[in-house]
């Protein structure tokens, strides 16, 4: 990383999370994350639309593409998406100002993503959605009720 990036007011730190399904080594992943224009957006309501995502995230810059996360079995929204900007600066603005804001009565979280690849739009949980929704103990109407494993007991 260039020294200028360390001194830049616009530089947004990487989180500790790393995609365990990333194909490549840790160094490659770090490099992609540091230069990426793509954000992972989590904790969305299952009812949040692509239009709502676009309206919110376009306040930080020009959005190139939005990919909504889908349940791999039902092909319905499952609470996450990827937002790609044309520039890193616009993506950094979103990380700084949109992370932790409320959308559809939910506090959303953003994180850097190494770049969208086909197939990543599908939930990785056994029941088709996100893994975190399988183990949820509390009732969450915005994310399908109780966790899938709790429902099956």
UniProtKB/Swiss-Prot annotation:
The keyword Transport applies. MRNA binds at residues 17, 40, 109-113, 120-124, 130-131. It is found in: Nucleus; Cytoplasm. GO terms for molecular function: mRNA binding; RNA 7-methylguanosine cap binding; snRNA binding. The keyword RNA-binding applies. One of its GO terms (biological process) is regulatory ncRNA-mediated gene silencing. One of its GO terms (cellular component) is nucleus. PROSITE patterns: RRM (PS50102). Residues 37-115 form the RRM domain. Its main location: nucleus. InterPro entries: NCBP2 (IPR027157), NCBP2_RRM (IPR034148), Nucleotide-bd_a/b_plait_sf (IPR012677), RBD_domain_sf (IPR035979), RRM_dom (IPR000504). Keywords: Cytoplasm, mRNA processing, mRNA splicing, mRNA transport, Nonsense-mediated mRNA decay, Nucleus, RNA-binding, RNA-mediated gene silencing, Translation regulation, Transport. Component of the cap-binding complex (CBC), which binds co-transcriptionally to the 5' cap of pre-mRNAs and is involved in various processes such as pre-mRNA splicing, translation regulation, nonsense-mediated mRNA decay, RNA-mediated gene silencing (RNAi) by microRNAs (miRNAs) and mRNA export. The CBC complex is involved in mRNA export from the nucleus, leading to the recruitment of the mRNA export machinery to the 5' end of mRNA and to mRNA export in a 5' to 3' direction through the nuclear pore. Component of the nuclear cap-binding complex (CBC), a heterodimer composed of ncbp1/cbp80 and ncbp2/cbp20 that interacts with m7GpppG-capped RNA. Belongs to the RRM NCBP2 family. This is Nuclear cap-binding protein subunit 2. The gene is ncbp2.
């Amino acid at each position: 990383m260039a020294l200028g990036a360390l001194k830049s007011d616009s530089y947004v730190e990487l989180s500790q999370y790393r995609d365990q399904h990333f194909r490549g080594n840790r160094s490659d992943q770090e490099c992609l994350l540091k230069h990426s224009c793509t954000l992972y957006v989590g904790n969305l309501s299952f009812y949040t639309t692509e239009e709502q995502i676009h309206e919110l995230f376009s306040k930080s810059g020009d959005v190139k593409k939005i990919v909504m996360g889908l349940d791999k079995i039902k092909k319905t929204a499952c609470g996450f998406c990827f937002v790609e900007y044309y520039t890193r600066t616009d993506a950094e603005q979103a990380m700084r100002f949109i992370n932790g804001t409320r959308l559809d009565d939910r506090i959303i979280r953003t994180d850097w993503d190494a770049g969208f690849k086909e197939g990543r739009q599908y939930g990785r949980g056994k029941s088709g959605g996100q893994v975190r929704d399988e183990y949820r103990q509390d009732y969450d109407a915005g994310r399908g009720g109780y966790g899938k494993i709790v429902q099956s007991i």
